[in-house]
Amino acid sequence: VSFIGSGNVAWHLAPALDNAGFVVKEVYSRSPQNAALLTERLYQAEVKASLDFSTSASSIFILAVSDDAIRTIAQEIVIPEDAILVHTSGSQPITELQFAATQNLAVLYPLQTFTKNQKIDFKSVPLFVETHTQEAERVLMQLAKSISNEVKKIASTERKALHVAAVFASNFTNHM
């Protein structure tokens, strides 16, 4: 597994996968310092200096980046031909990845607000999966079930509605 992004989602998701037995090999971030901080929390990960992963041993590439960066990174990233490209956004459709050089596209959406210094039990975080191929579905469902007890398949339109409702509920609760 390789991560693109080192923000709040990556800060929690990468160690959860590492602890579940998925080796996180590389972390790329616009900020190499932030990538280095994340790799310190992982067993074998190294900082990656560019989006050229053509020689990577990873088979899963997770874009844990801002919504507006997904499409640009999907267009620029170079990954092995059969690799799976995943984004973690609740509001962006899987089609944001369509310009990538792979057909194995997926979304892994954790229904959770993440803060770097907040401890989270990932087993209780609901994960929602959407994929374009059977192979991506098989791999992503296995990955998701290894870190969460609540895994469901969901389409982009349903995921966006769920995300909007969750944001509304969270903001309403915070406002009270």
Predicted region positions:
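Rossmann-like NAD(P)(H) cofactor-binding subdomain of soluble oxidoreductases
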Residues: 32, 42, 46-119, 140
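Short phosphate-binding/catalytic loops that engage adenosine nucleotides
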Residues: 22-23, 103, 149
